[in-house]
Amino acid sequence: MNRTSPDSERPPGSEPVWERPWSVEEIRRSSQNWSLAADAGLLQFLQEFSQQTISRTHEIKKQVDGLIQETKATHCRLHNVFNDFLMLSNTQFIENRVYDEEVEEQALKAEAEKSEQEKTREQKEVDLIPKVREAVNYGLQVLDSAFEQLDIKAGNSDSEEEDANERVELILEPKDLYIDRPLPYLIGSKLFMEQEDVGLGELSSEEGSVGSDRGSIVDSEEEKEEEESDEDFASRSDNDQNQHTTRMSDEEEDDDGDLFADSEKEGDDIEDIEENTKSKRPTSFADELAARIKGDMSNQLKEEQIADGKPQKTMKEKKEKRTPPDDEEDILFPPPKLTDEDFSPFGSRGGLFSGQGLFDDEDESDLFRETSRDRPAQAPVSEESSSPKPGKKIPAGAVSVFLDTSAPSLKEFQKHEQPTPGKNPHLPTPAGLFDDNDDDDDNFFVPSCNKPPKTDKVKSTSIIFDDEEGDLFREKPAPLPVASVSQADENTTRADKTITLPSSKNPKLVSETKTQKGLFSDEEDSEDLFSSQNSSKSKSASLLSSQLPTSGSLFGDEDEEDNLFGSAPAKKQVSSQQPQSQEKPKPSEQPKKKASALLFSSDEEDQWNITDSHTKLATDRKSKGELWDSGTIQGQEVKAVKKTNLFEEDDDEADLFAIAKDSQKKTQRTSLLFEDDDDSGSSLFGFPPASVPPATMKKESISKVPSLFSDEEENEVPSRVKSVDVKVGNGKEADVAKVTEKEGLLTASDQEAAGPSDLFSSSPLDKGTKGRTKTVLSLFDEEEDKVEDQSNTHVSKNDAEKGLKTDGRPKSTGVFQDEELLFSHKLQKDNDPDVDLFAGTKKTRVSVPLDGSLFGDDEDYDLFSSAKTQPVVPEKKGALKKDRPVSLKNEEAPESTEGSKEKSLWKAETPQDSSGLTPFKSREPSSRIGKIQANLAINPAALLPTAALQIPGTKPALCELAFPSSEPGRSHGPESVPTLAGSEEAGVSFDLPAQADTLHSANKSRVKVRGKRRPQTRAARRLAAQESSESEDMSVSRGPVAQLASSPILPNGHQPHLQPRMASGEISSEKAMAPAAPPWESGPALSAVDRSFFVASLPQTGNEADLFDSGDIFPKSIGSQSMEGTKVKAAETPAHLSGGSKEKSLVFPALSEASSTDDLFQTVKPRPAKKRNPFPLLEDEDDLFADRKGKKNELKSDSHQDIISKTQDIFEDDIFATEAVKPFQKKREKERTLEPNLFDDNIDIFADLNVKPKEKSKKKVEAKSVFDDDTDDIFSSGLQAKKSKPKSQSAEATSELRSDHKVSNIFDDPLNAFGSQ
């Protein structure tokens, strides 16, 4: 039945009932008749219902999610609204808070007043009276401080402050803001660099004191009184304000104008310095300051300004109170005194001490600075200041407090010690007042006032950068050494200039010259100042230890001591490290850098102190000018050190002083360098040499730094030096001579003193080896170029520096660039006797790098210029003996490229040298000026065979120019090689300024160009090595001549040394004459060598053709240069012996040209053999260095004798002759023994020489090879051959020199040259 009913029901569904979902009704109907169909239908129903439920749930979920999203969005909007309200409320809160404070206070006041109005209208008036009085007093103070009352009586007529009518009647003129607000220091000035406030902070502090008296005290009183009056109308505000106003009214009412009288007086005293107290003091201060400070108007202005700011109410109240102590000179009050007027006595410190009773703590830091500073300088100043105006000077103030309390002994020491040095008391007076004051505020003034005081300034600035800690102790030792310096009164005359300078500078020199301690007992004492601390300990240990300890102290010690030793010993190290820099280039650089870092870390003072120590070096260089060799070495070291410092300061100080210190230390130190150069450069070279010396300095620094860096290369170099030593079996003696010579370079005077050699024999023997190694490093292409620039730079620089020292003594260049420059100039001036050596030597040396040879050549020239410049070739040969075929050729190729440029440098240097050596320059420029231009055209591109003919006329002329223009040019021969690079832009015959400018820019550009040339030299080494094998075959027959030709290259590199040696020792000149003249007469090799020397004058076409065939254009050019250099050398050797080196150089060029003119070209043949010789040249170059150094020692000893007479010519002649003697013999032996190697080296050399840019270097190398054959002839031929040509071959030079330049054409196209052979 159920089934039936379902079935009956199913048909209407047209489908089985069990297959479709049943409805609820169906389920209910069939509930009684349940069947399987009902189960199926129920299942279907349930499934459908489940699906619907699920779908429904999903829909609800979606809706819920949408709701959540809406809710979140609403939440965000709500929060945004909250944030808006918060922002609004905060803004309104801030605004309301401001308004609320004002409104509430006013409301409270109004309420209180209203509550009390009935009671206290009278009280209110009484309460208002103090306020009104304060307001009036403040207003009057403002009028007094800010305005000058033209109508004083009208203002003073009213006894009551409240009367404003007559005040209105007052004619008020606003005061000059810059009375109270002085202008900042000159930008870039020492003070500007040293002081963070650049002179404004002190005055702001003074104004702060002034303003603090006016403003801070007045404002604080106003605030206090207003607060008190607001809080307690009748209580303190009435009492205090009434008392305050009573004081003011006593001043104002009693005077009726004390407000105005004070205004008048203060207006007047602002001008005068204060009211009665100030007017009294300022007159005495102004008188004392005018008497003592003399030059320090700005200090007085600052004092007056500070005082002007202070004649205010506090001036009246507190300063009147302070006035008695100020007058009394009480140590109790000196800081307040400083605030009032004691800063004005120390007007320069005025900022530091100036208004700063308030800022005594700051001043005390400065007091300690200046206590330490003033203790050296200000102790006498405090004596003088305390004696004439004890209260005011002691306010140096805090100085009296600290000096009297803690530093009376310092004061006494320095009073006695510094007054003991004649200059020191003179220095302390200005320096004590101003030199130390404001660190260097008065250094501007001090330079004029205290350039001799540079000792004090050195102390003070050294102490300044050693400011507080190191200074007190350092200065305490410093006064003791000064005492011992004053004990060494013999040296105190010099030491007075160098007393403190030796302290800061002589540590350098002491480290350089321990025997110079004996030379300069002051330096020992001053050294003891520093050696007491670190310096003499490290100095006693050794220069190396001194450099390491000094470097250690530079690094280990405080910046202060490090600066003393970092700047001074760092420079010592630099000077001694020029040899040592090879051992410790990085320590010296690190000391320099740390000195530079200290310069930055220890403030600008360190910088200045480094500059001071540089200046000290210059000063001691001059004070030690008797040891003018070391003086020049020091000068060059000073420049080298300064330059190194410049460069390391460029590295380190490039931050603050890359502009400031670079512009200052460079500009200033460079100014020192430059001003030494600029001052003398302006006179001797104009400023262009000064400009050149900056670049020169930079290059020196760079080259020296490379030398320092070349220590890295030294590792290579020692191995090469080993080979050099192997080759230099004889050369080791020469190397020892080199070492001694480099020692002499660094301590020319030391070696003259014989003890300095011990300085360097202790460390410089190692240094000598490393100096030789460094020379070898200099031989590296990098250093070759840089060293050539450096030697060029040093030639021009040392020449400029010496000429500058000679002419720069008047310190014509910017005093403000560096007071120390001024000081260094004055100190150099002060050391005029030595400077006379420098003067003669400088100018002469400018002409005749005697100093350049001894120093420029010994140190900068021998090590860098000759030893390095030539070592650039020779040392590279020594260092690169193994690599030398490449290195020498690289060198020679860069030198060839540089050669033309360096010949221009020779020219440029020749103008410098021409001052002393004008005859050569004068003789040759006529033929040379055109030739110089042709020489300029002789750039490596111009050196092509086609251009070679022009170039031969030009290049010999250039070599002649470089050398004859200053046969010191021969001494500059080594110098000239770098000088050619340096002087590329300026013709030798051109004016010195052009040289300086040319050298300046040329050095900069050439450093870069050389950097380019070095790879060229390397590439040229390979090319030249290939082609040199061809030319080697050519040159094998010419081996001795080629050695001679190569030797002249060494003369190019080393001739300066030979000449300085000859200059130093005419004996060596005679020796050089003996080998030089006999070689002319002696064996064919000698004649060939002499001919190679004389190639410039009469190159034998056959041999010259051989030169061309051999590709020895460079040998020819260089050989002719070297030959002519040797010829001129030989000529000048008798000339030097006769004292008419120029005349005899003219004579010998004629003789040499006549006798060996034919041989000149034969020598040109040997120059093709130069290709063989370069390795012998390497050996011989080492020998040259050894001989050079040994001869430099001779030259150093004899250079003093010959410096004055013929520093230029003698040095050139002697350098060549002297070098010609020893290296000539040794290198003849070596050439004989090493000619096969020479040929091998010639191959490599010409591989180097193949590069056109390095043609001249190649010539130099070949000249060195000639030097191997005949050392005398080598140098003469390398440097003098062309010089002789311009002399004898002025007419012949064009044709014959062109034939020489046919050889040059080979060098012009090194590849073609070899191919053209």
Swiss-Prot record:
It comes from Cricetulus griseus. Residues 201-213, 379-399, 529-548, 569-582 have a biased composition (Low complexity). This is WASH complex subunit 2. A motif (LFa 16) lies at residues 1238-1246. Residues 1003-1021 have a biased composition (Basic residues). A motif (LFa 12) lies at residues 1107-1114. Residues 349-1317 are annotated as: Interaction with VPS35. A motif (LFa 17) lies at residues 1266-1275. The modification Phosphothreonine is found at T323. Belongs to the FAM21 family. One of its GO terms (biological process) is protein transport. Residues 348-582 are annotated as: Sufficient for interaction with CCDC93. One of its GO terms (cellular component) is plasma membrane. InterPro entries: FAM21/CAPZIP. The gene is Washc2. A motif (LFa 2) lies at residues 433-445. A motif (LFa 9) lies at residues 815-823. It is found in: Early endosome membrane; Cell membrane. A motif (LFa 4) lies at residues 519-530. A motif (LFa 7) lies at residues 646-657. A motif (LFa 6) lies at residues 599-611. A motif (LFa 10) lies at residues 832-838. Residues 500-518 have a biased composition (Polar residues). A motif (LFa 8) lies at residues 673-685. Its main location: membrane. Residues 201-630, 667-817, 867-926, 960-1079, 1119-1141, 1158-1183, 1277-1317 are annotated as: Disordered. A motif (LFa 1) lies at residues 358-368.
